[in-house]
Amino acid sequence: MPAIEVGRIAVVIAGRRAGQKVVVADIIDKNFVLVTGAGLNKVKRRRMNVKHLEPLPERVNIQRGASDEEIKAALEGAGISLE
């Protein structure tokens, strides 16, 4: 299992959003990823350091750079909650 990949569910472990679950929407470079809460929690789409994320075994099938609506539909289809 790659640590960080597109579609991977992760928990934020540092900063104001610590404890929140997010979905990796895109990989920017080796240190940063684009994450989102897809409107299901208070985490907005933003760049985040990979050192501040703890990946979970859950994953949804999405394309790189998918919109929040597409990610939300994939999460609901897979029965995964970000709460």
UniProtKB/Swiss-Prot annotation:
Single GO BP term: ribosomal large subunit biogenesis
GO cellular component terms given for this protein: cytosolic large ribosomal subunit
Keywords attached to this entry: Ribonucleoprotein, Ribosomal protein
GO molecular function list: RNA binding; structural constituent of ribosome
UniProt-listed InterPro entries: Rib_uL2_dom2, Ribosomal_eL14, Ribosomal_eL14_arc, Ribosomal_eL14_KOW, Translation_prot_SH3-like_sf
PANTHER family, per database record: 60S RIBOSOMAL PROTEIN L14, LARGE RIBOSOMAL SUBUNIT PROTEIN EL14
Subunit composition and interactions: Part of the 50S ribosomal subunit.
Family: Belongs to the eukaryotic ribosomal protein eL14 family.
Record's protein name: Large ribosomal subunit protein eL14
Species of origin: Thermococcus kodakarensis (strain ATCC BAA-918 / JCM 12380 / KOD1) (Pyrococcus kodakaraensis (strain KOD1))
Gene from which this protein is expressed: rpl14e
